[in-house]
């Protein structure tokens, strides 16, 4: 079973051209969205149209024996309490945003905020996905982080542009390759019913360009809907202009799991060094869980004791460090390369003579001699 839009994204231009002709679609703009819309309108014979068009099954690599399109409710349905009847039906939240909207006025009043301001939270969300896949990219239970930024209705355009820029900067700050990130505007046919404008931050995975975060102008839709259902005002009083109004919202919504997958996929590197394969996780030093590993070259001649003292001093300075004394020094380097540790410090025979150690860079594998008493200062500069 496939989501139609995802299935079409994996088709060749020739196949898309064929189905466009069958459905009498002239424009190539937002082509997949238009094809999906047309297939839904021709729901009763959509399977035949897909077969006639030569839509390929990604698993078999052959034209699929397609059924007619069906629409699904992606919300998780459940029952509260011991009695399983219509009165106990509930749905797991598909997004974290609605809790923010319900509590908007409470947060605004108790924290004495003035517009514009944002409320952010992180938590579990659930979607009954038609098909899961690509490891943790698409799952039915996931961690979501969302920010609802409340502002005057006539200022949403400028704030949408502002948050698009800020969110792109955030992904860049994680060390993710800039050439593999893009900001894609939604076409009119793609927009959600509550949104007047939306942008997706996308990353180019091995399986193609896919969404990491959506930034949308939700207008006053959500607060309006909650007011209609509850008969309670969710308005803001502007003391300067002496007026009440419903704030508009610019939303930034990202999946934590997808962000983590992006960081790992972007950092994972396999390269050949001196005829040997090397696997390295090129994490940005600022997000690497361990910043530096310390190795005694040998487990004798006071090298372990000196190494442990260096580790303790580094930890006491607030830098995450790791002590590794097992195996050859080459294997220890490789272990830390795979774990994404940016720097390695080796205590060797010269250390016993001149109180210096070797500092190794993970990415370049270059080494330099530095004095033990300058280790922390040098690490702070590099990090």
Where in this protein do the model-derived segments appear?
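NTP/phosphate- and nucleic-acid-binding module
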Residues: 1-383
